[in-house]
Amino acid sequence: MAPPVAERGLKSVVWQKIKATVFDDCKKEGEWKIMLLDEFTTKLLASCCKMTDLLEEGITVVENIYKNREPVRQMKALYFITPTSKSVDCFLHDFASKSENKYKAAYIYFTDFCPDNLFNKIKASCSKSIRRCKEINISFIPHESQVYTLDVPDAFYYCYSPDPGNAKGKDAIMETMADQIVTVCATLDENPGVRYKSKPLDNASKLAQLVEKKLEDYYKIDEKSLIKGKTHSQLLIIDRGFDPVSTVLHELTFQAMAYDLLPIENDTYKYKTDGKEKEAILEEEDDLWVRIRHRHIAVVLEEIPKLMKEISSTKKATEGKTSLSALTQLMKKMPHFRKQITKQVVHLNLAEDCMNKFKLNIEKLCKTEQDLALGTDAEGQKVKDSMRVLLPVLLNKNHDNCDKIRAILLYIFSINGTTEENLDRLIQNVKIENESDMIRNWSYLGVPIVPQSQQGKPLRKDRSAEETFQLSRWTPFIKDIMEDAIDNRLDSKEWPYCSQCPAVWNGSGAVSARQKPRANYLEDRKNGSKLIVFVIGGITYSEVRCAYEVSQAHKSCEVIIGSTHVLTPKKLLDDIKMLNKPKDKVSLIKDE
């Protein structure tokens, strides 16, 4: 059984830090407070705790700082907010004058560094009402136990749009992301060696240099930290174009498949059972979800009915009856039994919904996609004519435009770019002129679509001996990278360090005398060395899965993967389509 979320990885680390730096800092026995959150801190707290946890910390009400609220002048307020003008102005409005103060006093905790102009604004306006004003350095969302996101929705556009007018916006986004990544490292108590993928774009290089400088500054200032030199961890920064295939391929592992094929929003799955509409949240508190989310759909469909039978046999052993009334009685006596059944019903529905979509259209696509992605068929024979593999998909009227675009992209990726003439012909024949930018704009990510010169394809690790399903032969590039990083096999020209490489990662035994003392290299790895990965512009659920798989295989090193956001193929193609549009038009379309 999976441990509860309170004991689970990154979420637990973040919650413990918030408890220590926020709640323990302002807690008084028997005193209740109102808590004010902005959009980001609402997501942050929701990702790592429940309302019951907040009640235990003396919080009686949680409110949105942006909304109009009734004054509660007899109570103190705890503000957990981002250091932005909008959030600070809302706080100042609450304490506009002594006679109009909304609350008795304020405890302010910023997620990260508060700029001097905002700090001085607070100091000048209402310093007498403030009991605390601190920065806690947690400016990311722990999405899963080994996954973090920065929640920077504009990052993809600013980092990859070709519009030179976006240069200032891009610089600002880069600074923000660097600050946030530093808080990830600080929360994990790490000062990693920073490396980046050197080609084809310079985003990763720029961001890595910023992060390196900010890490240096952070550990100079943070007197409480024992870490001054580099620790035994690595941080890899990568541009999204490093692996376009994994972003558009149909994945058949459970979580990736469900988020691709079904309308799951905010991790909420809607389904029907007994003629009633129901909702379920796909979260790590659900031990069954944790157990099966990275398994192939074929395995999931075998496993859930087996679990149903196990519970059924438990019921029979307990009651000796199989009637509905006996089952009802048992559920009353054993609430955990009802909870187990509910979970299994949810996941069986989810798996069946995935399979219905798969059988309808996706099954025929998958063989084509795998052959194009790998350049070989299921028997290991080389694909000689990629166009011949693609054509049946384009001629099939049952496939929608989005699936055809995904197949065309895989075809182009497989041959490392095509000619303008060939691309025009494909677009016209499939009648996707209005969506053609979903294909062409990949070039802004450094992916060869209509290349000026022939580029070599990166070499892949030989995985032919690994056991796979025929329609799931592709392995995301990021798994190769993670494994090579842990085994110290990354090419230093392709993956330069921003500063001197930590000794333990370059095979040397020397360790900085200033760094946090640890027993020895092997002991350190055993106690949890970290490989932290950051992808600029989104990660896929298949890449998320790789972080868990590699951690499981290399128990001496935990892989933590993160990005600006977690993407699905459809959302990514929509974002790519907008890259050559003006920023105001992009915002307008998204608002609609």
Swiss-Prot record:
Primary site of residence: cytoplasm
Signal peptide: none
Keyword presence, Cell inner membrane: no
PTM description: Phosphorylated by PKC in platelets in response to thrombin stimulation; phosphorylation inhibits binding to STX4.
Any single GO BP term: neutrophil degranulation
Tissue expression from the record: Megakaryocytes and platelets.
Statement: the UniProt record of this protein carries the keyword Lipid metabolism: no
GO molecular function: protein-containing complex binding; syntaxin binding; syntaxin-1 binding
Source organism, top-level taxon: Eukaryota
Family note: Belongs to the STXBP/unc-18/SEC1 family.
Oligomer status and interactors: Interacts with DOC2B; the interaction is direct, occurs at the cell membrane, excludes interaction with STX4 and regulates glucose-stimulated insulin secretion. Interacts with STX4.
Protein name: Syntaxin-binding protein 3
Organism: Homo sapiens
